Curated annotation (Swiss-Prot):
Motif (PXVXL/I motif): 155-159
Protein name: Inner centromere protein
InterPro entries: INCENP_N, Inner_centromere_prot_ARK-bd
GO terms classed as biological process: chromosome segregation; meiotic spindle midzone assembly; metaphase chromosome alignment; mitotic cytokinesis
UniProt domain comment: The IN box mediates interaction with AURKB and AURKC.
Chain positions covered by the region annotation Interaction with CBX5: 135-270
Subcellular location(s) per record: Nucleus; Chromosome, Centromere; Chromosome; Cytoplasm, Cytoskeleton, Spindle
Coiled-coil portions: none
Organism for this UniProt entry: Gallus gallus
Function: Component of the chromosomal passenger complex (CPC), a complex that acts as a key regulator of mitosis. The CPC complex has essential functions at the centromere in ensuring correct chromosome alignment and segregation and is required for chromatin-induced microtubule stabilization and spindle assembly. Acts as a scaffold regulating CPC localization and activity.
Bias type Basic residues, positions: 62-71
Comp. bias intervals (Basic and acidic residues): 98-111, 261-271, 500-548, 572-591, 598-615, 624-695, 707-742
Any single Gene Ontology cellular-component annotation: kinetochore
Length: 877
């Protein structure tokens, strides 16, 4: 079942995907292709003389506008008459075309979410995405323009700040009266035209058909229903108010006109000041803005126009053409304006529309038979700079219009005490939005919701200082023909309107028209002068560039000539050096050739001399060889004779030697027998001597022992006697006893050191000599500090020899063994040296090295020898 459902839905899903794909291709891919095609066509149609349109400006080419904050200008209001308006502010304003505004606001309209009825309205107009050129093209606009707009009739709605606020109040009080006024001022079609409409259309020579799209709030539905005579749809929640760019500028003109009218009223009666009230309504909380806001800080929610439209030279030329055409139209319309100015003001200025109202008013261009058809439906664009130049002219005319407007509204509006005055922040917001629309728009106009009605008792007028600041902002941001010493007038408007005489009103209109014509002539003169000045500057710049190019070319030629000259100098110097080197080389070669020839001659002479010397030497050698051969022959003969004689003598000698050998053999045998006998006799004598010596030694030992015993007895007796004497004289002679004791101790030490026991042995070398007194070093008191027992002097051992080593037989055996050493290898065999690693199970590198800390070469006394003799000083003989 699920498979069947999936198969049934498959065509629907495929159709949806295909529709999405086709929509994406139409909206994105084809749009890009069309735009690329248009840009390519424009590029190939410009004869390659225009600058690239799609290339952005570098940061150095961008001329960003820098405005002062309104709060910063408040403190400078008193210095405005003395200060000069900045030319940079007027010169840096870029020309913003009406087509750019319409495209920007159309893009905003495309991005807004519309309801169901708004979608129906958008389906009647353009619904698909457009390229930048299509949005800018006037052909698309001609499709939705009504027929009466193409036939010279231009319905105009002029909306000022005060009119908008009064209209909000009137919507709630007298909707029916306002509806009648709307229908009277704006006819529904072109069939029932009135003189007011034609005069209003003629009094507004709009050079460009631009549209300003303002979103609407639901509070203006009633007003939209009353305007069904010139609307396409009636019950739409979100529609647009389409105003011309010229009309946006006229809002400020109306403000300035009202300022002039109120200032005239201020001259007649004193101004009234009111205090602040905490109950003053200030409108919606969302629509309020701070006065201290940055003009550049608001994020823009609209899309920028393309760089091709912004920086195109073709568009600049188009704008210049449209400006000139607009001037000619103004000249032609001037007499007509003079005749129908009053009716045009009543028809165009009596309309009061709030800012958020849904109204569609399209401003078409005036009929110009000389312009091509493209300019008819596209409209003539005028830059902001040209509009701001003419703004002073429009202020005079709109001031007169305001006078008639106030008189006509007096019959249908309640007294002005019941009208709401614009609040502090709403006035700032309105002026900021107007300036943004004129400057090309850093951000879109914010949505305004009308404030709730408020009784006149709660309305608080703004301070005069704030109004001064607003007027100053207008003067600073709008370049006009205001003099340097112009006086800032008050914005304060009283509740009671002035009553104007119709003749005075007509006179003022004529005067305003005359001033406007004079200002137009002055502006044209200034434009011509500026044009001439720019042409002169361009000519000077061109001449300067040509001069610089010529200078650079001359400089390059000079550098090239200088370089060639240096190269020629280098080549000449190189040739000169080469020639000099070649001459030097030839001279050296000649000298070398002469030296070589001389050497060859000398070598030839030496060779001849050597040849002669070799010949002489060869002759001498031959003579010497001949003489040597003769001598050798003689010597050989003498040798033979001498050898014969020697052989004879040797033979006789051999015979004699044989006889002598026999005799010597006999004598040797006799000598051997005699030696054997002598050895036997000598051995017997020696044995007898040893026995005798042993007997004598025993006797000597016995005598020594007996003598020693007697000496010990005597010593004991002497000691007893000495002890007794010492005890008797102990009390009397203590110092003498101490001295004697010291002397005895010293003598005892000397006896010990000089004891004959060390030198009294038979084997000692000093046996028959007197002992030498030891040499005592006073620094170490005779002590050998660098030695131990192993370094005792063997000639004078410090330890006594034991009794077992002092026997006569032992000494004789030692002497015999010393002179006749036994063959140890024959007696005991080869003794292998022990391996200490195997015995101690350790391996040390210093087993077979002497590791004693003693200094073996240091003698005990300074006069002793470092190398000792044989042990016991025994010498071989």
């Amino acid at each position: 079942m699920a498979v069947a459902t999936g198969l049934a839905r498959l065509p629907v899903v495929c159709n949806q995907r295909l529709a999405e794909l086709l929509r994406q291709v139409d909206d994105v891919d084809l749009l890009w292709l069309e735009e690329i095609h248009e840009e390519a066509a424009r590029m190939f149609g410009s004869h390659y003389s225009d600058q690239p349109e799609l290339m952005p400006k570098t940061p150095s080419q961008k001329n960003r506008k820098r405005r002062k904050r309104p709060s910063a200008l408040r403190g400078e209001s008193l210095e405005l008459g003395r200060r000069r308006l900045s030319r940079r502010r007027t010169n840096n304003l870029k020309a913003v075309s009406s087509k750019r505004d319409s495209q920007r606001l159309q893009n905003k309209e495309d991005t807004e979410g519309l309801g169901t009825e708004a979608q129906e309205l958008s389906s009647q107009t353009v619904s698909r995405r457009l390229t930048r050129s299509q949005v800018a093209a006037p052909a698309d606009r001609s499709e939705v323009l009504p027929e009466h707009l193409r036939e010279r009739v231009v319905p105009v709605v002029e909306i000022s700040v005060c009119d908008r606020i009064s209209a909000e109040f009137q919507f709630q009080k007298c909707a029916s009266e306002r509806a009648e006024n709307h229908s009277a001022s704006l006819p529904p079609s072109s069939d029932d035209k009135s003189p007011k409409e034609s005069s209003a259309a003629e009094s507004q020579p709009l050079p460009a058909a631009s549209e300003l799209i303002v979103p609407h709030t639901p509070e203006a539905k009633g007003a939209g229903k009353n305007k069904s005579a010139f609307k396409k749809t009636a019950n739409v929640a979100d529609t647009t108010v389409v105003l011309s760019e010229k009309e946006l500028g006229l809002e400020e003109v109306d403000d300035s006109a009202q300022v002039q009218k109120h200032n005239e009223r201020d001259d007649k009666e004193p101004s009234q000041r009111t205090t602040d009230s905490p109950e003053t309504p200030t409108g919606s909380r969302l629509s309020r803005r701070s006065v201290r806001r940055s003009l550049m800080g608001k994020p823009s929610t609209i899309r920028r126009t393309s760089l091709a439209e912004k920086y195109s030279l073709a568009r600049k030329r188009e704008s210049t053409i449209r400006k000139s055409i607009a001037r000619t139209v103004i000249k032609r319309k001037a007499p007509q304006k003079l005749s129908v100015s009053s009716s045009s003001v009543n028809g165009s200025g009596s309309e009061e529309v709030p800012e958020d109202e849904e109204t569609v008013v399209n401003a078409g261009p005036p009929p110009v038979p000389q312009t091509p058809p493209k300019l008819d439906f596209q409209g003539l664009r005028m830059s902001l700079r040209s509009q701001t130049v003419n703004r002073n002219e429009q202020q005079q005319e709109t001031s007169n219009n305001e006078c008639d407007l106030s008189k006509s509204e007096k019959t249908q509006e309640p007294p002005q005490s019941a009208r709401r005055k614009t609040s502090y922040k709403r006035a700032v917001d309105q002026r900021y939005d107007t300036q943004q629309a004129e400057d090309g728009g850093l951000s879109p106009l914010r949505k305004k919701t009308p404030s709730p009605p408020c009784p006149a008792s709660k309305v608080v007028r703004p301070f005069k200082t704030f109004l001064h600041t607003v007027e100053k902002n207008q003067l600073l941001m709008t370049p006009s023909s205001v003099g340097r010493n112009g006086v800032i007038k008050s914005f304060i408007k009283y509740n009671t309107p002035l009553q104007h005489d119709p003749k005075e009103k007509e006179r003022q209109k004529l005067q305003a028209l005359r001033k406007k014509e004079e200002a137009e002539q002055l502006r044209k003169q200034k434009v011509e002068e500026e044009k001439k000045r720019r042409q002169e500057e361009a000519k000077l710049r061109r001449e300067e560039r040509l001069r610089k190019v010529l200078q650079a070319r001359e400089r390059a030629e000079q550098l090239e000539e200088e370089r060639k000259r240096r190269i020629e100098q280098k080549l000449a110097l190189f040739d000169e050096k080469t020639e000099k080197a070649r001459e030097e080389r030839l001279a050296e070669e000649k000298i070398k050739k002469r030296a070589a020839a001389k050497k060859m001659e000398e070598a030839e002479a030496r060779r001849r001399q050597d040849e002669e010397a070799r010949k002489q030497k060869a002759l001498q050698q031959e003579e010497e060889e001949r003489r040597h051969k003769e001598l050798m022959q003689k010597k050989k003969e003498e040798e033979q004779e001498r050898a014969r004689k020697i052989a004879e003598q040797r033979q006789a000698e051999q015979e004699r030697e044989k006889q002598l050998a026999a005799e010597r053999e006999q004598e040797r045998k006799k000598e051997q027998e005699r030696k054997k006998e002598e050895e036997r006799i000598q051995a017997e004598k020696q044995r007898e001597q040893q026995e005798k010596a042993a007997r004598l030694q025993k006797e000597v030992l016995a005598a020594k022992e007996q003598l020693q015993k007697e000496m010990e007895k005597k010593e004991k007796e002497e000691q007893l006697l000495a002890e007794m004497k010492r005890q008797e004289q102990e009390q009397k002679k203590l110092p003498e006893e101490q001295k004697a004791k010291d002397v005895a101790q010293t003598q005892h030490l000397e006896n010990k050191e000089n004891s004959p026991a060390c030198n009294s042995y038979q084997m000692t070398p000093q046996y028959h000599k007197d002992p030498k007194p030891p040499k005592i070093n006073p620094n170490n008191y005779g002590m050998d500090l660098n030695s131990d027992d192993s370094t005792d002097d063997e000639s004078q051992p410090r330890k006594p020899i034991p009794a077992w080593a002092s026997g006569n037989q032992l000494s004789q055996a030692v002497i015999r063994q010393y002179y006749n050493p036994p063959n140890v290898d024959a007696l005991f065999g080869t003794i292998v040296s022990p391996k200490l690693e195997d015995i101690f199970y350790k391996s040390k590198p210093r087993y077979f090295k002497r590791t004693s800390s003693a200094v073996w070469n240091s003698p005990p006394f300074p006069g002793a020898k470092s190398v000792l003799g044989l042990p016991y000083s025994l010498k071989k003989y």
